[in-house]
Amino acid sequence: MATHLVIGDPHCTPKASNDRLLWAGKFAHDLKPDTIVCRGDFASMDSLSSYDHGNNSFEGRRYKKDVEHVHDALEQFNKGLNGRRPRKIMLLGNHEDRINRTVDEIPELDGTISTDDFKFKKYGWEVHEYQIPVVVDGVYYCHNFPTGVMGKPISGDNIGRALLIKNKVSST
């Protein structure tokens, strides 16, 4: 039987230490999972947030700082793994997708910024696009499962039940 370690939404940001990724890597080393799945939002990408853009609190956020902080977090995680090489799957989330949305809004940035800037593959991760499920040992993983014509995430009081009813598979 395969063991999966699931990491949900780390939201790496220059405002927070990456020590927790070192600890997570050490935990993964000790647990010895066959597969590690990060369910997305590894990066917070505060520099591309649309929620408080234009406010004084936004000043100081920079794309380059966000990306460099993600690189450091990936290095810390691998350091914690201490040579272990389980399969690592990175599902892109809506925070990584901020890059794609920014390029859609400002086409001049096409080819200048992209999710490839995170270099997840360099750090040993398989990368899967936002809202595209991946199946590992019969379990479906996705940052959020889109539903309906608009592709909005499944939501409500009992998301687990809704996932089973709509997808009819084990999913997380």
Segments the model singles out, each with a brief description of its role:
Residues 8-11, 40-43, 94-96, 144-146, ...:
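Active-site metal-binding loops of divalent metal-dependent hydrolases
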Residues 1-75, 83:
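N-terminal active-site segment of His-dependent metallophosphoesterases
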Residues 4-6, 35-38, 90, 140, ...:
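Residue-level marker for buried hydrophobic side chains located in beta-strands
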